[in-house]
A protein has these predicted regions:
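Amphipathic alpha-helical segments within well-ordered protein domains
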Residues: 33-34, 51, 68-72, 86
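Iron-sulfur (Fe-S) cluster-binding segments and ferredoxin-like electron-carrier domains
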Residues: 27, 66-81, 107
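Acidic, glycine/proline-rich low-complexity segments that act as flexible tails and inter-domain linkers
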Residues: 1-48, 98-135
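Short cysteine clusters
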Residues: 60-63
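Immediate flanking context of iron-sulfur cluster ligation sites
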Residues: 41-58, 79-88, 118
């Protein structure tokens, strides 16, 4: 298991516990996530790249892992991720020289796990594991 996959795995159980403790808030977040990340004027891949940049600027390792994985699943290329991360560097300065490479390494990790797609023009369901309210 790679470093970023381990970040996601480490968050899985604590997230389940918190989701059970505050199901309404988590259900609301899941709805917000689904609405914000669906294809629209911007496709889901572009939105995942935007989220990855935001994760770098916010210095959120868990967010970086989730959105790097989702960007890989959406078919983002290394060139697209590198270009997006240059915007993070512009907006965040020095700290992005640490978090940007983490994000790029996470993307590369998940790209290695990405199965070959028969039709690269078709989007894949995003890899973000949005915790939804448990009944």
């Amino acid at each position: 298991m790679g470093t970023s996959e381990q970040v996601i795995a480490d968050l899985r159980e604590p997230t389940r516990v918190l989701r059970r403790a505050a199901p309404g808030a988590w259900a609301g977040f899941a709805t917000l996530h689904d609405e914000a990340m669906k294809d629209g004027a911007l496709d889901a891949k572009v939105k995942e790249l935007m989220a990855l940049v935001a994760a770098v600027v916010k210095h959120c390792d868990g967010c970086i892992a989730y959105h790097a994985k989702a960007a890989a699943r959406q078919g983002a290329t290394s060139e697209e991720v590198a270009e997006a991360l240059s915007v993070a560097l512009l907006m965040d300065g020095g700290p992005s020289t640490t978090y940007g490479p983490r994000a790029f390494a996470a993307f590369e990790e998940f790209t290695q796990q990405r199965p070959a797609r028969e039709d690269p023009g078709q989007p894949v369901a995003d890899g973000h594991e949005v915790p939804v309210a448990a009944s």
